[in-house]
Amino acid sequence: MQLKIKEIFNQDYVKLEGQKIQIKAWVRSNRDSKKIGFLVLNDGSSLTNLQAVYRVDKIDNYEEIAAARMWAAVVIEGVIKLTPTAKQPLELEVLNAQILKQSDEDFLLSNNDLNLETLRLNAHLRPRTNLFHAIMKVRATLAFAVHEFMNQNEYSWLAAPLFTGNDAEGAGETFSIQKFDNEEFFGKQTHLSVTGQLQAEAYAQAFGNVYTFGPTFRAEKSHTNRHLAEFWMIEPEMAFVDLKGMQDIVEDLVKHVIKAVLEKNQQELEFLAQRNDENLIKKLQKVVESKFERIEYKDAVKILADAVKNGHQFENNEIFFGMDLGSEHERYMCETYHQGPVFLQNYPKDIKAFYMKLNDDQQTVASTDLLIPGVGELVGGSQREDSYEKLLKRCQELKMPIESLQWYLDLRRFGYYMSSGFGIGFERLVMYVTGVNNIKDTIPFPRSHGQIEF
Amino acid sequence: MQLKIKEIFNQDYVKLEGQKIQIKAWVRSNRDSKKIGFLVLNDGSSLTNLQAVYRVDKIDNYEEIAAARMWAAVVIEGVIKLTPTAKQPLELEVLNAQILKQSDEDFLLSNNDLNLETLRLNAHLRPRTNLFHAIMKVRATLAFAVHEFMNQNEYSWLAAPLFTGNDAEGAGETFSIQKFDNEEFFGKQTHLSVTGQLQAEAYAQAFGNVYTFGPTFRAEKSHTNRHLAEFWMIEPEMAFVDLKGMQDIVEDLVKHVIKAVLEKNQQELEFLAQRNDENLIKKLQKVVESKFERIEYKDAVKILADAVKNGHQFENNEIFFGMDLGSEHERYMCETYHQGPVFLQNYPKDIKAFYMKLNDDQQTVASTDLLIPGVGELVGGSQREDSYEKLLKRCQELKMPIESLQWYLDLRRFGYYMSSGFGIGFERLVMYVTGVNNIKDTIPFPRSHGQIEF
């Protein structure tokens, strides 16, 4: 019976006592005296290792197995033996062992205390460390949980285009495509998309509920621990849903994906808690159980001004209606004022994107950011401007190229009653759920200014 | 009770008789005499429309509702009435109706007989047609079914990087990124990736089973109905799996996703069968039930040569060992010789990529293509070269830049016993399952040479 390590530990393993099994795995460590040796094995299915005990009087090739180095690939046949008094509840008594492929002696990451920067420089090998095993397994759980939530709620996944001829999507610097054979491949200057929202709106007006889950690109030169040039976004868009209804969906989605990790990745979370943040699991459980607070932007400004009055020091203490809140202000709102997730809502129009619905006060737009302790902004969303005339006016005010947005404006001419949507930076979500501090450690092969290895 | 149309028809709707419900939807058509009118409504949840009957003696705003144009957004309250003798099993007797947003008169796609080219020029509106509703819903089912299969089988989803400094991934022309502020943003010339396979191998050596599902880019100027500049690929990679084991996984995956569509999208398939290919459903059922054939490349060459000898005319009748099979030859193999999916395997090394495992005959590599009736190649895969020396030699023979591939070569130094993987062009899969002839009609906003609208 060939088993994966996860299959062994995920069942009532008492029943496995005395069973003969086969396992293919990599050696994590190997120590031997002259008569008995211990292989610690991992096959990638689990953070848990399986210990295999080999004895000189049981196998013919004791010397060969004793020479298996870290990350050698091996195939082991053995009998499961319960070890109730040991740290591990069971081990494998080796009957037969073969080295499938020896490993070179200079494996770079054999030292467990390597710093994150060194691991980043070895992004092809870092998934073999416990830390990156844990992070990337949680990441995979989050990704599937997003698709699962969307599928359960009848959202169709949408592939938004990545090449765009439109430089006016309203979010930062874009990458451009070089000419090909001395001509523009697409017939005009082409950028890499920074959002799939505009196209998602077109599909929401036909399907009701859609979502994108794909890469986006931003040519930001910042070298902070919160920016990547290439990252993944989830952008749901719902027709017939207003700002408040959209916030409910954000809350349900965030809770669903965190619950999935709490259920599936207990072991990884325990490891990450130990390594990154001892309160990690409690923090996640609290999010799942809490009701997300909703606070008007204008009230947040008062709260922050009061905090300054009462002696709280921000780096930027100049608080006024119309300001773009800094990360420090956002974190104050969700970490100090309210200790948990907070939606701020109805921001001044001048600090938000052109497509957001103008409120009756003519000053603010129907927008919301979800602020999360330790991260700040995790989700940004809005109800979209549904009036052709108002949207056109706003585009003109901002001197945007109307022609390339005409199709987007035209959506408003054909029954565009209401649409709301939001964007989640997927790597921000991974940061939050894993407690990792640097966004470059949340994606397998990070791309940022000056960094393109692998 | 607010319901979606899909919820109405997906339940035992006899129970709904006499129930009062509310629905928000768009008008697909509206006709009235002076006393009675009929709204055909769709809310995007289903291909099925709901007919709502409004009467001048039941509602105050009969004239207003009678003026609702195609794609006007409306909210209707009414009572479900079963209509066993009509084509539709039920209708809505309107108690209250409001136009939420009128639609302009010049809706472009009001004619049902528009050709596909016109629809492509209106890619923002085409999801409102029955045809694109059906195609894109099937597409969404396929995408989720891929994630579902992978999750059930313990594969971790991997975000392969899209920016690459490596121009040697072995597949066609690439797009390059323009300099930014007069310098290379990433410090060296940067391309858009054509595959995530190399990075997937790194993760397979840590996790066992991984898969990518993301966009890839190819600067192909061809204007055929089978090429896009931007398309989506699924690339699973499995450690400890050989060519034959990999073919089993391909077969299971293809059957799983087709089964999902047969179960979830019966209505869409019936529509597509009527429109595209009357044998569509039978064809899909046959794939699910059949055992995929496996034929050696060298035997295929003999079969094709025999066909020519027996009078079959290919455009290219020159059949020899070492040739790259054309689409016509591939289709002969899966449509005429064997009427169903066929794996060809063990191709000559010179027509395949550098990373494929050299077979003992020194002539062929452990590669396979899955050929599907009506499409040709749907899947390409291989067992990877696991020997550092052989892989290095092959890179040198092909004059590839070793330096930027050193990390990939190095994987072989640390327990790289075995790895196999494959790639599925997602849009090819959608073509096959929907019976659509042009790949531009399988993706919401197609990008190809000269085409970048929306």
UniProtKB/Swiss-Prot annotation, chains A, B:
Keyword flag rRNA-binding: no
GO CC terms of this entry: cytoplasm
Matching SUPFAM superfamilies: Class II aaRS and biotin synthetases, Nucleic acid-binding proteins
Catalytic EC class: ligase
Name the UniProt record assigns to this protein: Asparagine--tRNA ligase
Family per similarity comment: Belongs to the class-II aminoacyl-tRNA synthetase family.
Subunit description: Homodimer.
Reaction equation(s) it catalyzes: tRNA(Asn) + L-asparagine + ATP = L-asparaginyl-tRNA(Asn) + AMP + diphosphate + H(+)
EC number annotated for this UniProt entry: 6.1.1.22
Organism phylogeny: Bacteria, Bacillati, Mycoplasmatota, Mycoplasmoidales, Mycoplasmoidaceae
